Amino acid sequence: MSETNTQKAAEKHEFSAEVGRLLDLVVHALYSDREIFLRELVANAADATDKRRFEALTDSALALPENASIRINPDKSQKELTISDDGVGMTHDELAQNLGTIARSGTRAFGEKLNAAKPEDRPSLIGQFGVGFYAAFMVADRVDVTSRKAGSDEAWTWSSDGKGAFTLTPASRSTPGTDIVLHMKDDADEFLDSWRLRSIIRKWADHISWPITLRETKEDGTTEDQAANEGTALWSKPKSEITPEQYAEFYRHISHAFDEPYATLHWRAEGVTEFTALLFLPSARPFDFMEQSRESRIHLHVRRMFITDEAELVPNWMRFVQGVVDTEDLPLNVSREMLQATPVLARIRKAVTKRVLSEISKRAKEADSGFNSFWENFGAVIKEGLWEDAEHRTEIAGFARFHSTYSDDLITLDDYISRMKDGQDAIYYLTGDSLDALKSSAQLEGFRARGLEVLLLSDPVDGFWPERLSSYQEKPLRSVTHSHGDLEKFESVEADTTEAADVEKLVPALKDALGDQVKDVRSTVRLTGSAVVITSDGGPDLTMQRLMRRSGQAMPAMPPILEINPKHPLIKALAERVAKGESVKDYATVLLDLARVQEGEPLPDPTGFGRSLATLLAGPAAE
């Protein structure tokens, strides 16, 4: 450490308010799972060592020592537990930033998830949110972190009791890396016991590629550092030598999750490009799963050396896949920029995607409850592939699951086609914001009355992909919000003797009153209980138009079509008014806004709608 650094004074900093809340959440909500603190600290040490090794590929000055390891030293006499590594280390500013602040949104999301999670699921949230370091305060009254950045001669000690503040003090460390010293609480003595520590390491960190040593005290009082983990790359072993428990432990290690993997894929590819892959399909959904910014974090290794988890080894709609791909066909010093352009990676990506797709398809055909649960968790993102992955769109459509008006069970498109009525040439669907809203939509009335099944699509991407898929098994996909004459081809299965009003004069009267607010006004057979509905005449359906407007995309004005039900009492009454020569102008806008409300559309003038409705209701109320 330089003389300049030793002359610097200690600094006191306040935790950000978010860290204070986070510490309280972690310490109190996860108390019964305190052993995970060691898993998180060891995982952080391994990540730091991986990072230094990678950076040393392009800067030899950062090279790791030959005996690089993660060292765990319990000291019962001092009630201290030390975890040391030879990793990349942290600067003064990185210590303050990484250990003293956290994004406000991250804290809030973490708290919400923690409160909602079952007790057995809470530990997994620590790793998923990247806040594992703070788990140390479950077992320690004070935590000291001494770190020296690789390539620097300065070291600093970050210290805190987790009660609102931390200090940064100049320190000394002979080599780059980090030492974390936990000053243990009185009720945490078990974590100073070598046997207990070894069992935790075996449970959570046995397959970390770096050697983990544990300092043992012999009977004569001397100490010895002994190997505590196997340190063998699990994926390099034959499948016959790996137990399901070992697969599950490795999955939990690499994913920071606690669920059991839904499926495990372990294979070696040989040919033009050779690689070994160990991949997992999760059974539980991560907290940030639906974020578009989230990417797959499959680890790419070259000859067992971690290179990156940003290689995009599967398309974004497969971002739930976890695991490792290891190859000898790439150079160790390949840059991340060059990596994306290499044909080797392109071949690996294609092979991995094909294998994962095949596994999902195979399990879908088994049609067990396990797949339906998997689909409920991950189907919303898999359907992104219907929108963005032209190469695999048809295969995805073959195993995709959907809700429909037929029953509460999930169905496939093949199920739908097998039940199509004679003369039906299209697959009907309705998109919207929620399944409950779709089930009660006025758009379905005429289809239900004629026994025509309709797919109910309520995920965000459902507003987009039907346009790209366009057809399945030569059957076009058709939104029920499009104005079309399909319903007139089918007789109603429900007896309806209600007489329809003559709306020949009402239709043009409403159209004149509404002007360019609508494209047209039409009498319809699609309604059985509602008075009105809005539809579109080709182009994007109503939901897609709404999504495009929300996202700020420029789009031409697309006035809706207002369809009226000639059998509804309100429409009959308005038809009588027109026949008597009375105006329906005040009613026209209310009818259009009523149809918009039914469809979940925003009203252009909510105040005006309220006033008009109140005025119209005042007449009958006064009688």
Curated annotation (Swiss-Prot):
Molecular chaperone. Has ATPase activity. One of its GO terms (molecular function) is ATP binding. Residues 547-623 are annotated as: C. SMART domains: HATPase_c (SM00387). The keyword Cell inner membrane does not apply. The keyword Cytoplasm applies. Keywords: ATP-binding, Chaperone, Cytoplasm, Nucleotide-binding, Stress response. It comes from the Bacteria. PANTHER family: HEAT SHOCK PROTEIN 90 FAMILY MEMBER. It comes from Gluconobacter oxydans (strain 621H) (Gluconobacter suboxydans). Residues 1-336 are annotated as: A. Belongs to the heat shock protein 90 family. HAMAP family: HSP90. Signal peptide: none annotated. This is Chaperone protein HtpG. Homodimer. Residues 337-546 are annotated as: B. One of its GO terms (cellular component) is cytoplasm. It is found in: Cytoplasm.
